[in-house]
Amino acid sequence: TPFGEHLVCQVGLIVENIERTAQKYCDIFGVEMPPIQVTPTYDVTQTTYRGEPCDATARLAFFDFGQVQIELIEPDMQPSVWRDYLNEHGESVHHIAFIVKDTGAAVAYLAGHGIDVLQQGLYGDRSGMYTYLDSAPALGVMLELLENFPQPR
C-alpha cells in the first residue's frame, strides 16, 4: 500500500477556542504553550474543498508527544472540512494523519476503496501538501495524508 510503515503521525482535534484548549493541554501535561498559527488563504495554499477553491482558514497549535503530534484546529466560519465537522460533531477528534511519499498514489488507492478527497491544499510554507479524505463511513475516522516535498540542498 502507499502508506509505507503505517505510522500514525498526528491526531487532529477540532476545537471552538484554541487558546482555552491549548492551555488545558499545557496544564494537564505540563508542556509549554505552542505558537498559534493561522493558515494562509487560497492564494498561498491553493486549497480546494469538495473540488472547489476554498478561502477558509483555521488557527492551529501543535503539541509533540513522542512520535505522535496533537493538532488543535479552530476553524473560521467559511465552509471547510474543519467548519463542517465542528458544526456536525462539536469539539472532538477530527482526523488521524499518515505521512505519505506520493499523495497521488495514496489518493488513487483509497479511491479504489470508495474513499474520496474532501479537502486538499499546500502547507503555508509550500513545503508539502495535506489531503483530507472522506474515510469516516468506512473507517470510523477521517484520514489526512501529509506529503513533505523534497527540499533543495
Show the residue positions of the predicted features.
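Extended intrinsically disordered, low-complexity coil regions enriched in Ser, Thr, Gly, Ala
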Residues: 17-40, 83-91, 100-125
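Conserved short beta-strand elements that form part of the metal-binding/catalytic scaffold
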Residues: 32-84, 127-150
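Vicinal oxygen chelate
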Residues: 1-2, 8-16, 60-68, 85-102, 104-153
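Catalytic phosphate/metal-binding cores of nucleic-acid and nucleotide-processing enzymes, i.e., regions
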Residues: 5
